Amino acid sequence: MDSIATNTHSSSIVNAYNNNPTDVVKTQNIKNYTPKVPYMCVIA
């Protein structure tokens, strides 16, 4: 979908989500997004 946004921003989020889901929870809470869909924050 958004390959550019995915390569630049979501890549670090996906990596953190795969390695440390709790880190993503904190990051997503700041952006008011659910940690279940870390890639949606970039698409939306």
UniProtKB/Swiss-Prot annotation:
The modification Cysteine methyl ester is found at C41. GO terms for molecular function: mating pheromone activity. GO terms for biological process: cell-cell signaling; positive regulation of pheromone response MAPK cascade; signal transduction involved in positive regulation of conjugation with cellular fusion. Induction: By nitrogen starvation. It is further induced by a pheromone signal. Its transcription is limited to M cells. Its main location: secreted. It is found in: Secreted. A lipid is attached at C41 (S-farnesyl cysteine). One of its GO terms (cellular component) is extracellular region. Pfam families: M-factor (PF03855). Keywords: Lipoprotein, Methylation, Pheromone, Prenylation, Secreted, Stress response. It comes from the Eukaryota. The keyword Secreted applies. Residues 1-32, 42-44 form a propeptide. M-factor is a mating pheromone produced by M-type mating cells. All three mfm genes contribute to the production of M-factor. This is M-factor. It comes from Schizosaccharomyces pombe (strain 972 / ATCC 24843) (Fission yeast). The lineage of its organism: Eukaryota, Fungi, Dikarya, Ascomycota, Taphrinomycotina.
